[in-house]
Amino acid sequence: MKKWLVVAMLFPVLAVAQQNHKQYEPPSAPGAGQKLLAKFAGNWNLTQTFFPRTGKPIVTTGTCHQYMVQDGKFLESDFTFYRPGGKKTTGTGISGFDPKTNRFTTVWFDSRQTTMSIRQSDGTFDGKTIVLYSTALDPDDPGRKTVARAHLEDNGHVLIYRHSLIGPDGKERLIFEMRLTKK
């Protein structure tokens, strides 16, 4: 009796183990989001304007090299920022789009801090603008609510990225804007 019970319990495990990787996790092809991300690829000069709550905006410059990776499924973005006083910082972003969920997800890390930030869209995509919301990594500390929007202008020669803080009342306050111009 015990033997049959063990066999009955192991059978589903063995059946799942017989699945190959493609059956378990089928590959997905690039979708509409990857088409837009591919338009972001290239070498860019950038101007970043930070809007503090009080005082004058702070303007810095930089460069960005963006390129598609993993057979055209993800956009990698390598930024160099030239801060006031001659200090240079760097940052890297990885952006992807899941055609099944119609969602963009981005991960960002930089030389200024040891944390990573993750943003994700809500599943609506008009084919032109990427809208991302902050995603909390710590369920006990959701952090600030932010929204970031990116779109192309001037026939793809200008990329505008705006990042806003969402207040408790739902109103947005622009924190910074990056204007990237294709080299």
Residues covered by each model-derived region:
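Positively charged n-region of N-terminal signal peptides that target proteins for export
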Residues: M1-W4
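Hydrophobic small-molecule pocket/channel-lining residues, especially in calycin-type beta-barrels
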Residues: Q18-K183
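Hydrophobic h-region of N-terminal signal peptides that target proteins for export
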Residues: M9-A17
